[in-house]
């Protein structure tokens, strides 16, 4: 018979000699296995027995995977250790060492990294399969062991592989060139399977992602790469083999100014990482989320996410990638006016190897801004031009990674050298081409500071449009602040008062206290009282298109300029303005600004 109560059953089991109980657990595990039971109950009995019979290896690995996916990391690690200890073959034990490292990695990469020396040796000895070697190389790169990583990658490219394995190797090599741009002085060899099938054949999503990332690194962001990233993300959940690929897909979106899509996916992935009990994955994603928030001008959020990234993982476990949260945190604190905290984080030691990585470029960029904010323009210029020198040497001179020319131009302006600033700003604009972007908007803003006063408003209006279109609220606030100064210099005091108020409000939405303190003396609250209740009601009868035309007209744009910005004909603009004048009972553009300035500012 069966004892009905679990306490009674446990009491009986507790009376059995240990060797008898072990034997019972082993017999139960074998019976379950022979009956085709699920791996988890079998693993439960084997863990209780503390033994892994010859037949149990695959079952234990599958059970561990299920436990890890469900967030039971400690239990999953215990099952993997049992499988490893019971393995008899050299290749099997090596593969289980990789699985153990991956499981430990989700908690603490620095601790998991103690296995890498033996795994690199196993890879060199031919004891690891292709997938295990790819994983080992990724981990070696992350912790800054570049010589060993290159050795593993070189060995992989010499192997005969399946198309799927070749795709993973190809992504690894592209990822290595992205994270360590100076690592490969020559183009690494293609895997043999890739050479056989031809470069144009994309055998799986990771191969397509590698191609997209490679294209972005060579030519900058493009719509095809964005589509690839957007198609990749829904197909892969967060797991041991996906963090690098997911990071690559998010990087493509971020570099392409698709911050809303990147935000959506990062938030979803953060939920997955929490469910899987993976603090290192959470840390990585918080770091990315902080960068996204910073690019959108959400300074308080950027700081919060960067602090969460550092809280979820120690500095040794961040290794060379610590440049991601640190650079975000420094930039956010500068914008928030918290120089003390920015200084404290700059004083934190960082690994020398970080400056060989793309994350080191972000750190230099942030440190340069710190020097600018503290009046050390020469030091800032040195950091920005060092970025430029490294990017040129590494053949990744892409403003989407770091727009060093714009910020070097800012340093030259601080040094009272406007001619050099203009040369760099114009060079940046030439490199960027016609497509709008955050960096192009920043370059236009710097260029405006180097031209005669009468030419500044047009450049700054273009900059505000681009910042707005890219979702960069902080950039928009700075451009509006510059526009208000340009308007005041030309004697256009009414527009200047309204523009500076708008800059102040946008800066407030970003929590940009440093900028708000600068703007506060020029803010005229009386300018907000010009729109009475009836005027407000009339303004809200306008269609969205009419409001947009009214805002641009009030800012001083010509009908042709409005048509170009809104992608409509001049005739359409004229028709909209006629309706605007009639609905608002005004006869000229100046009346729009005087009577409805604050309302128009809300659109701008």
Place the predicted regions along the sequence by residue:
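Short secondary-structure boundary elements
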Residues: 1-78, 82-85, 583
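Helix-coil-helix junctions within alpha-helical repeat/solenoid scaffolds
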Residues: 5, 74, 79, 84, ...
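Short, charged/polar, Gly/Pro-enriched secondary-structure boundary elements
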Residues: 9-12, 51-57, 148, 177-180, ...
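Residue-level marker of regulatory loop/turn positions in helix-turn-helix DNA-binding domains and
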Residues: 21, 52, 401, 541-542
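Alpha-solenoid repeat junctions
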Residues: 36, 50-53, 104, 108, ...
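Short helix-coil-helix linker/hinge
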Residues: 36-40, 473, 541-545
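Internal alpha-solenoid helical repeat scaffolds
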Residues: 39, 71-324, 332, 440
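Helix-turn-helix DNA-binding segment
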Residues: 482, 529-604
